[in-house]
From Swiss-Prot:
GO terms for molecular function: zinc ion binding. One of its GO terms (cellular component) is nucleus. This is Protein yippee-like PJ691.02. The lineage of its organism: Eukaryota, Fungi, Dikarya, Ascomycota, Taphrinomycotina. Keywords: Metal-binding, Zinc. Zn(2+) binds at C16, C19, C72, C75. It holds the Pfam family Yippee-Mis18. It comes from Schizosaccharomyces pombe (strain 972 / ATCC 24843) (Fission yeast). The keyword Metal-binding applies.
Length: 131
């Protein structure tokens, strides 16, 4: 599936709670005020090291969206979704951004160890083999 490239991060980051793979820099956090399927969630403008599944339409509390579920590229744990497109004009600001579930999928680290954080190129699967 590719080679792991460890990166030493000097700033705060969010990592997969299961395997500690780096997912997002704190600086890419847009908002804490979201709810995921499993509890509290955060909106990010960019994430790393994820597998994007097929796009599908979902009805959420703020309207209908085309989304791609995202999984950690290392352990394949479900961690959230990407907003591909909104049907509601008032929700278009979410397009292209990501929701990370905070309850079980990710946790915040102050000083990650170099071997704990990995950067992978984005991976997009056309079939949902992890659902």
């Amino acid at each position: 599936m590719g080679r792991y490239y460890p990166v030493h991060l000097k700033s705060r980051c969010y990592v997969c709670a299961k395997c500690k793979t780096h997912l997002a820099f704190k600086g890419h956090l847009l908002s804490h005020d979201y709810r995921g399927k499993n509890g509290p969630a955060c909106l990010f403008k960019r994430v790393e090291n994820v597998i994007e599944m097929e796009p599908k339409t979902e009805q959420m509390s703020t309207g209908r969206f085309i989304v791609r579920h995202i999984h950690c590229c290392r352990c394949h744990t479900y961690i959230g979704w990407k907003y591909v497109s909104s049907y509601e004009p008032s929700q278009k600001f979410k397009d292209g951004h990501y929701i990370l579930e905070m309850q079980d999928a990710v946790l915040q680290r102050d000083d990650p160890e170099p071997d704990d954080c990995f950067i992978h190129p984005p991976i997009t699967f056309l079939s949902s083999s992890f659902s």
